[in-house]
Regions:
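A short alpha-helical element within helix-turn-helix/winged-helix DNA-binding domains
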Residues: 27-38
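Short amphipathic alpha-helical interface segments
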Residues: 10-24
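Basic amphipathic alpha-helical segments that dock to polyanions
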Residues: 17, 44-54
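Short helix-coil-helix linker/hinge
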Residues: 4-8
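Non-DNA-binding regulatory cores of transcription-related proteins
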Residues: 70-163, 178-179, 186-190
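Beta-hairpin "wing" of winged helix-turn-helix
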Residues: 55-70
Length: 190
């Protein structure tokens, strides 16, 4: 799996829409997002069309229009978005669950390369399918707040820690929620 520029921009745009939503901004214009992320507006609009067709975002025309999330953030999984934009997560097609194509190997069942790539595919899918937009927005806002960084979506110079409620660590299925990708929150023991 290689994340294309289109896939990267789609994920960044969704994260920005999620942050804006959490800050109480109902919509963002494509030009505002493009300026923040330093992306071509036309390319971003094409990505939004694809995300809109899949039901991830909605748009409103007019002076106060723009884009907003069409689904709850906890219903948007990163693996699904990447599959939509870039296709299968598998590094080779013969291990893909969504775009399987038989490889040229004469004995696919006993192919060592296929077994290795299947493990790679499963690890990637497990990680990307575990994270929701809500998780990543929470992690991002926590870091912005901790570092006392002003949100790029607030025109005034209000610090995030004055705007945001404290973030509480949640647990899912007895497992700690991630504070940042790949690290869990743990209290120090004396």
């Amino acid at each position: 799996m290689k994340l294309s520029k289109r896939g990267e921009y789609a994920l960044r745009a969704l994260i920005d829409l999620g942050i804006a939503s959490e800050l109480g901004l109902p919509m963002l214009q494509a030009s505002e997002l493009a300026a923040k992320e330093k992306l071509p507006v036309k390319f971003l609009e094409q990505i939004f069309m694809q995300l809109k067709a899949a039901g991830y975002v909605e748009s409103k025309r007019g002076k106060f229009g723009g884009y907003s999330l069409a689904k709850r953030m906890d219903r948007i999984r990163f693996g699904a978005v990447i599959r939509l934009i870039d296709g299968p997560l598998a590094p080779i097609r013969c291990v893909s669950q969504t775009g399987y194509v038989r490889c040229s190997c004469p004995d696919e069942v006993h192919c060592g390369l296929r077994m290795l790539m299947l493990d790679v595919r499963n690890a990637i899918a497990k990680l990307l399918d575990r994270y929701t937009l809500a998780d990543i927005v929470e992690i991002t806002l926590r870091k912005l707040r901790r570092d006392k960084v002003t949100s790029p979506f607030l025109s005034r110079s209000t610090k995030l820690r004055a705007v945001l409620p404290p973030v509480i660590n949640r647990q899912e299925n007895g497992q700690p929620k991630f504070n940042s990708v790949g690290s869990t929150s743990r209290k120090r023991r004396k």
